[in-house]
Curated annotation (Swiss-Prot):
Homodimer. The keyword Flavoprotein does not apply. The keyword Hydrolase does not apply. InterPro entries: Class_I_gatase-like, GATASE, GMP_synth_C, GMP_synth_GATase, GMP_synthase, GMPS_ATP_PPase_dom, Rossmann-like_a/b/a_fold. ATP binds at residues 232-238. It is an enzyme of class 6 (ligase). The active site is at residues 87, 179, 181. Catalyzes the synthesis of GMP from XMP. NCBIfam families: guaA_Cterm (TIGR00884), guaA_Nterm (TIGR00888), PRK00074.1 (NF000848). This is GMP synthase [glutamine-hydrolyzing]. Signal peptide: none annotated.
Length: 529
């Protein structure tokens, strides 16, 4: 199986490069700039192509070249491994080979136009010689003067004349100032496809091949040891647990912790799904009192996540001891969790996830995270490959910390119960209306702000609740629903929201105002905390 290594210099869209390559049938993995690729090669680990990502820094600030870049270009020289640099990666290549890179007089952000002045195997079938093409730019630095020796210019900015695409055909090194991985660059997917053809990559990465590889990896990693699985009933932990069960069978022990922060009737739903449909035994632990006690008086969302993560691990360590010789803890961590938590060296932390940033530094169980490098849509595809029912795979994402991060401010028993009922009304009505399967994720948020209202002849003073519904494919970007729908569809959804608002206010004491969150991701995250 071919592998493309992506060196991550901190771009918030690095994961999109990985997704695009995988969509083209080639396995890709993201590595930090400190990676020793020469050592990997000496151990027989074969990389078929390298992509250097964009990033927020400037090559003018560099004190020497990152180890990974030196390794990549040495492997290119020694073994002919093709290299593609994108944005900062392009500037890094130019800098490495001796070109001057400096801050641009005119920076380019967003849509930009290029003049195509030379042909290239990367743009074959995509751009025509002499044409003007639009791309997506996001950069402050540019090459000043000539491109490095051995390189030629394929395209320049129509506005500034700056080099936008250079290549060294003999060494199969390509640098683009724009972002071919984003949807805003027409033909970007085809350019990446051409790069993979140049690298001679085989198109054999599928969920079937991933499943086969992971089963072997799980068997090897656990080495006959027993694993306790943290399941929630959500898509990620369900797929992960079924995958691990397929690999090691009864050595997997599934544990469901009722934190008191879950959706209405969640424990019963989990029992029905795992025992009734998957024939897997589940130990249910009611730890709601413990979690509520630990969260008392806490308002900061990062502190809440940290407390929940630490308490989860504590509970599982205790359960592992009671079960006997348990050495591993399985979690349903997926790639967006890792990216948003800023675990990589160059990434910017957005918020911690209890599966990642919420973990204590010292833990007595080794982690098994079989989905760590998969995006949400890939997890669902893997679930289908494993034969999981749609009742599991079609569920909307639910955060590990549960309702605690959908209650702004302090978490109290009263607020949890109120939000649980609000959310249940919203989701039940969404299912009844036929909207549920058209929406990536929908939920309610309780805002600790009280507003004045009137019901009957009396004054009310209740909480505000916010409703959210978004469309997405992988959770990395999202639009509020019904963005992009027809005007008729938008009016229908507005009428639906009015019905939900009336149902919430009429049936629940404590809420007298309902609002709808119209924000996309970015600039917001999907969850409020």
């Amino acid at each position: 199986m071919s592998t493309v290594a992506i060196v991550d210099f901190g771009s918030q869209v690095t994961q999109l490069i990985a997704r695009r390559v995988r969509e083209l049938g080639v396995y890709s993995e993201v590595f930090p700039p400190s990676t020793d690729f020469q050592a990997m090669a000496s151990r027989g680990i074969k990389i078929d192509a390298f992509i250097l990502s964009g990033g927020p820094n400037s090559v003018q600030q560099l004190h020497g070249v990152p180890n990974a870049v030196s390794d990549v270009l040495n492997l290119n020289l020694q073994k002919g491994v093709p290299v593609l640099g994108i944005c900062y990666g392009f500037q890094m290549l130019a800098h490495y080979f001796g070109a001057d890179v400096a801050q641009s007089v005119a920076r380019e952000f967003g849509r930009a136009w290029l003049d195509v002045i030379e042909p290239s195997s990367i743009t074959e079938g995509v751009w025509s010689l002499g044409s003007k093409v639009d791309v997506w730019m996001s950069h402050s630095d540019s090459i000043v003067g000539e491109v490095p020796q051995g390189f030629r210019v394929v395209a320049r900015s129509a506005d500034t004349g700056a080099v936008a695409f250079m290549c060294n055909d003999e060494r199969k090194i390509y640098g683009v100032q724009f972002h071919p991985e984003v949807a805003h660059t027409p033909g970007g997917r085809e350019m990446l496809d051409n790069f993979l053809k140049i690298a001679g990559c085989t198109r054999d990465w599928t969920m079937g091949s991933f499943l086969h590889t992971q089963i072997g990896a799980i068997k090897s990693a656990t080495d006959g040891g027993r694993v306790v699985a943290a399941i929630s009933g959500g898509v990620d932990s369900s797929v992960a647990s079924v995958l691990v069960h397929k690999a090691i069978g009864e050595r997997l022990v599934c544990v469901f912790v009722d934190t008191g922060l879950l959706r209405k009737g969640e424990a019963s739903v989990v029992r029905d799904l795992f025992v009734g449909k998957l024939n897997m035994h589940v130990n249910v632990l009611d730890k709601s009192a413990l979690f509520m006690q630990r969260l008392a008086g806490v308002q900061d969302p990062e502190v809440k996540r940290k407390i929940i993560g630490e308490t989860f691990i504590e509970v599982f360590e205790q359960e592992a001891k009671s079960l006997g010789d348990i050495k591993f803890l399985m979690q349903g961590t997926i790639y967006p969790d890792v990216i948003e938590s800023g675990v990589g060296e160059s990434g910017t932390k957005i918020k911690s996830h209890h599966n990642v940033g919420g973990l204590p530094e010292i833990m007595n169980l080794s982690l098994v995270e079989p989905l760590r490098h998969l995006f949400k849509d890939e997890v669902r595809l893997l679930g289908k490959e494993l034969g999981l029912p749609s009742a599991i795979l079609d569920r909307h994402p639910f955060p590990g910390p549960g309702l605690a991060v959908r209650i702004m401010g302090e978490v109290t028993a009263e607020r949890v119960e109120l939000l649980r009922e609000i959310d249940n009304i919203y989701i039940d009505m969404m299912r009844d209306s036929g909207l549920y399967d058209h929406i990536w994720q929908a939920f309610a948020v309780l805002v600790p702000v009280r507003t004045v209202g009137v019901m009957g002849d009396g004054r009310t003073y209740g909480y505000v609740c916010a409703l959210r519904a978004v469309t997405s494919s992988d959770g990395m970007t999202a639009d509020c629903f019904p963005f992009g729908e027809t005007d008729e569809r938008k009016l229908e959804f507005l009428a639906f929201l009015q019905k939900v608002s009336r149902a919430i206010v009429s049936n629940l004491q404590g809420v007298n105002r309902v609002v709808y969150d119209m924000t996309s991701k970015p600039p917001a995250t999907i969850e409020w905390e």
